[in-house]
């Protein structure tokens, strides 16, 4: 199996089309198809499922892709170090639920370790995608929460994927809403208080489920609900629609200056925020330092 074959497969997976990948790689489509078939035969697996509408990765293919990406990254590091005679790049990656404190901790990590040359990866994404990223070694670790509401299913999925979850700290849920919201003057807000207003939840794609939701109490039916895929949209909907979302309350003043506030939720629930690794995975120096930065955001009185 040649490195070039791995690069071909990564490109096909990236663009989702053998035809388009062949154009970008400046080779013929038959040559690319033959290379993929040869790799599949050598690996003893089917990497892509072909159909009239395009290609999709198989489960084995997704796992293969994770290892292939590691090989290519290591080759690039070798070339950087010994072919170009430049200092090697510092590399590190995180997949996280939509928390600003994880992003801020990442900024501090880059400031601390970012030398002249580095290749860092930070991905805010859905819960199940975080598990996939860690499992397929797209990233070094994943950040998510476990609660009483989702614990049984989450721990089952984590175990089935040969991953492990370690708690960093716990936090009480808070409601995020704009400072001009009718509920903004309350010291504590209940789910009942929130009923008249639009609820904002992050999209989880094909894994839409209360167990993979990033927001507590998402199983409670509401009349008004908006699903979004980025924090910028959430801010706009809070400001324009008196909408709200439920999160950890950690670092509450990050949103739109002073325009967004957080209020403790009355319901008795706890978010156990932690990190996910592959079984028997040892964190490198950057991983350990990133966890140190995250712990700085632990609530004083969870």
Each predicted region: which residue ranges?
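Flexible hinge/capping segments at coil-to-helix
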Residues: 157-173, 177-199
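Central regulatory/effector-binding core of bacterial HTH transcription factors
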Residues: 89-153
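Hydrophobic hinge/microswitch elements
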Residues: 135-138, 145, 204-261
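Secondary-structure junction motif
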Residues: 102-108, 151, 190-191, 195-219
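A short LG(V/I)-centered, amphipathic sequence patch enriched
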Residues: 40-57
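Short helix-boundary/capping micro-motifs
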Residues: 10-28
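Beta-alpha-beta core module
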Residues: 160-166, 171, 232-281
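Alpha-helical linker/hinge and terminal dimerization helices associated
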Residues: 42-43, 64-86, 101
């Amino acid at each position: 199996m040649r490195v070039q074959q791995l690069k071909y497969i990564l490109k096909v997976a990236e663009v989702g089309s053998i035809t388009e990948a062949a154009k970008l790689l400046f080779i013929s489509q038959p040559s690319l198809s033959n290379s993929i078939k040869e790799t599949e035969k050598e690996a003893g697996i089917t990497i892509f499922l072909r159909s009239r509408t395009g290609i999709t990765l198989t489960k084995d293919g997704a796992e293969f892709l994770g290892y292939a990406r590691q090989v290519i990254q290591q080759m690039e590091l070798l070339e950087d170090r010994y072919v170009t005679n430049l200092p090697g790049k510092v590399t590190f990656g995180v997949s996280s639920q939509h928390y600003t404190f994880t992003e801020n901790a990442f900024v501090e990590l880059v400031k601390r370790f970012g030398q002249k040359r580095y290749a860092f990866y930070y991905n805010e994404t859905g819960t199940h995608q975080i598990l996939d990223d860690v499992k397929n070694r797209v990233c070094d670790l994943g950040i998510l929460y476990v609660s009483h509401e989702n614990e049984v299913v989450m721990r089952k999925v984590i175990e089935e994927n040969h991953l492990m979850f370690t708690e960093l700290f716990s936090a009480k849920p808070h409601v995020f809403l704009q400072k001009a919201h009718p509920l903004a003057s309350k010291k504590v807000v209940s789910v009942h208080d929130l009923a008249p207003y639009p609820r904002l939840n992050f999209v989880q794609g094909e894994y839409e489920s209360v167990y993979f939701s990033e927001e507590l109490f998402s199983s409670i039916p509401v009349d008004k609900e908006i699903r979004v895929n980025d924090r910028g949209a959430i801010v706009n909907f809070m400001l324009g629609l008196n909408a709200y979302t439920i999160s950890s309350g950690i670092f509450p003043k990050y949103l739109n200056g002073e325009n967004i506030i957080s209020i403790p939720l009355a319901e008795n629930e706890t978010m156990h925020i932690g990190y996910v690794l592959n079984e028997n995975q040892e964190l490198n120096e950057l991983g350990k330092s990133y966890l140190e930065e995250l712990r700085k955001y632990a609530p004083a009185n969870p």
